[in-house]
Amino acid sequence: MKKLICFPCAGGNAKSFEKLIRGIHCFVICAEYSGHWSRYEEPLYHSMEDCIQYQMQELREKITLQDEIFLLGHSMGALIAFELGKNLLNAGYNVKGLYLLACMPPDEINDTDFNFEDDEEIKLFLKRINQMPGSVLNSDFFRENLLPSIRNDLRILKNFIGAYSSREAIDCNIVCMCAVQDPLVNEMCGWQRYSQRKIKEYYYQGNHFFFHEQENTEKIVELINLEISD
């Protein structure tokens, strides 16, 4: 069976892929990180390695060695998808492809971009990449329910990037997608260093969350369906 597994951004949740997965022509699994959204009462991850190990354990219950596996990740989720892809291949799973959205390769990300002195700086960062209104950022709901997981994810992302040294290239197809107005991602061609195959790159109009725009959603769904059907 063909299965697409989706990983959200820092502080994100499975619902962020709601529009995207409606038209996908295969079985879809949307990961929900511990301590996020529907799993709010569970403990947050201590590190990226902790997150990846936990995802591996969960996926073993949902996929088989006979399945054709495709991994999709947005922003931090793209890094998780890439690391999981390597781990799954090493464990004997049939990983066919990665769809990496809005994320440069780890050696091109500056960990100092995630040096936040306080929560106000995190809010400014979110407003810059997502144009999130102040009414949301300053709400009690955001402060109590969303900010803790965002703060933690940005911390583990910073630590992961700062310590990253691997140059292992994955042996599966990689499709990179990002938006030309994304303030965090200039280009994604650097992923070629991490692939044993020729990568594909696609650029769209929009910001860091470009795949939420209907026109982009339709194009991405069409692209993924074509890739999966090959």
Language model features: what each stretch is:
Residues 1-230:
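Non-catalytic, mobile gating and regulatory segments of ester bond hydrolases
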